[in-house]
Amino acid sequence: MERIGDAFIWPFRDPDWLSKVVIMGLILLIPIVGAIDGLGWMLVAIDRLRAGEEKLPPANFDYLGRGVVLFVVFLVYYLGLALVAAFLFVPAVVALSIQGNGSGNALLILIGFTLLSLAFAVALLGVLAIIFATPVIVLATDRGGVAAGLDLGGVLRNARKTPINTLIAGLMLIAAHFIGQLGPTAPAKT
């Protein structure tokens, strides 16, 4: 793809794009299995794009095998982030709950709120970092499996090779997440 706009146009070149996207959207509603199949479908779509094909892959459950590897990689990243945030969040909750009885210690309350704010900041920045690294993680996992996807040093090296492309892809993913969240909140036509 020479231009970013091609990324948005390519799926629409398939005459059956609407039915495929709707069916995959319905599959994605299934907890865990839908996400695994959706990740596999995305990897097959990337393969077709690289091969120069103009059609999206068929929408079905044939992609669970490819998707499970990528799902495991992202699960490890997000669980690691959750553990780091919990390491800060749990002491904050304990400190603040102790101060809820009677007269509180101002220093412990300050420490509790500081840890709480730090836990939120770590979680937010971590999620943004994972979103920005998603294209690199996907490509590394697709090429080398779980070990390559979890090789944080390799992922960061690849992200720094083309920082502009990584930044653009990350911003596109954030925009896609934002647009995806608008769907459930859009008012229904009557």
Q: Where would I find each of the regions flagged by the language model?
A:
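Membrane-interface extramembranous regions at the lipid-water interface
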Residues: 1-26, 37-76, 138-172
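Phosphate-binding glycine-rich loops and adjacent basic patches that engage nucleotide phosphates
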Residues: 1-10, 100-102, 113-121, 167
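Hydrophobic alpha-helical transmembrane segments and immediately flanking/interface helices
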Residues: 88-107, 182-190
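Ordered, amphipathic secondary-structure segments that act as subunit-interaction surfaces
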Residues: 75-87, 91
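Membrane-interface segments at the starts/ends of alpha-helical transmembrane spans
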Residues: 14, 18, 64, 104-120
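Membrane-embedded alpha-helical bundles that form the substrate/pore pathway
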Residues: 66, 73-74, 78, 120, ...
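Selective recognition of hydrophobic, aromatic-rich stretches within alpha-helical transmembrane segments
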Residues: 28-50, 82, 108-149, 170, ...
